[in-house]
Amino acid sequence: MCRGCHPHGSPIAVSGLAKPGRAAAFRKRSMANRTVSSIESEIEIFLSKCPFLASSEDEPSCVAKFHRSEIEVGELLGKGAFSEVYQVKAVNPCFEHEDEEENLRCVIHEACKTQDNDADQFIVKHLRPELLTQRTAFNNAAADLVLESKFLAALDHPNIIKIHGWAANGAKSFGDGSHDGFFVMLEQLDDILSRRISLWRKDPSSAPPMEQRLGYATQIAGALQYLHSKNIIFRDLKCDNIGFKDGAIRLFDLGLCRELPENSSRDDMFLMSGVGTPRYVAPEIVLGTGYNLGADVYSFSIVCYELLAIAKPFDLYNIGMYRMLVCEDGERPQLVASWPQELQTLLTSMWDAESSVRPTMDEIHSQLSEIHSKATPGALTSLLSSLKFPKRLVRMATGSFSEGTSTTVTSAASLNK
């Protein structure tokens, strides 16, 4: 993310033919400038249909404003289809702001000064530079990033990533013609769930006990319960968008979140763009029949299964096979026989083909919390000991729950039909 590669500031007028590099940079800046009004218009229309975000439109007191030149970045930490994430090395405030805003900026400045290589605290997220040559993609991705920042500023839950700063000029920051003109500053996570599950699959002995994984699932459910209470659908729940910070779960990458109409019921279906990663996408999205908050419930069932079974369902399926075998024929992952019956029943209900049959996140969080409390070794050991079971049987009983394994349904049998 070298700023020298994408010059900031006003275009320089030259006589005669412009040099190819300068001409390309000018075209990129011009394209970004032209799309600012389009982005702002799209966001205004979106907010007019979002009671929760509209009610949170006042400037949040917990988000600091920065100019891009005030932030020094380090290594590239990751990239998605439309955005990049960089580590923040330093924050050097050089523009004056109101007292309250200046205090926030100073707090982040001091935090960056005191952090060491093992305690990085902040990241910046902005668009990828390639989008400057793709006007439609740039416009859509820019609007999604601005909306994500607004959602994060309005939301407050311990299992949703925290926003600490953003571009001082809001969406107008795209007008400087650079891909990183608008950005968000977020807390830096320690790891992501997909990476941890991959490590656990390679080395099962490194996996945390079942009760701890159930605790993670309960935290994810709590974050979704909170979003759904605001009528917000996540739309892109997957293990790649779930992280860890100081041992706790964080949902992140909220760019595809949308707010459903305030007076909608759980049976109302909405035609929105089909988004998400196939393995986690609800059948109704793939089949184009409309969807609602129940789509998140289906996605959570697959995340939950992957987390608890340490197995990746439908791993060998392409999108065509997923549509035919899972969405049309109703294939689902194979449950682990040693799991409690109430957990198996809950998962089965969450991935039901009919959205209206799936439980709400309120119900799911409540049931998972109860299952988790029963699964803790202390609770089970105490119960069995009170019933005068021999210590050897107590150890066997409390260890068996976390030792269950799963045989994931793969594509081989289906392909041979």
Task: Name every feature range the model reports, one short phrase each.
Residues K162-D180:
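Short beta-strand micro-motifs within the conserved protein kinase catalytic domain, predominantly
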Residues Y216-A217:
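Activation segment signature within eukaryotic-like protein kinase domains
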Residues H228-F244:
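Catalytic-loop of the protein kinase fold
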Residues K245-V275:
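Activation segment/activation loop of eukaryotic-type protein kinase catalytic domains
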Residues G175-I192:
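Conserved short submotifs of the Hanks-type protein kinase catalytic core
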Residues D296:
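Conserved catalytic-loop aspartate of Hanks-type protein kinases
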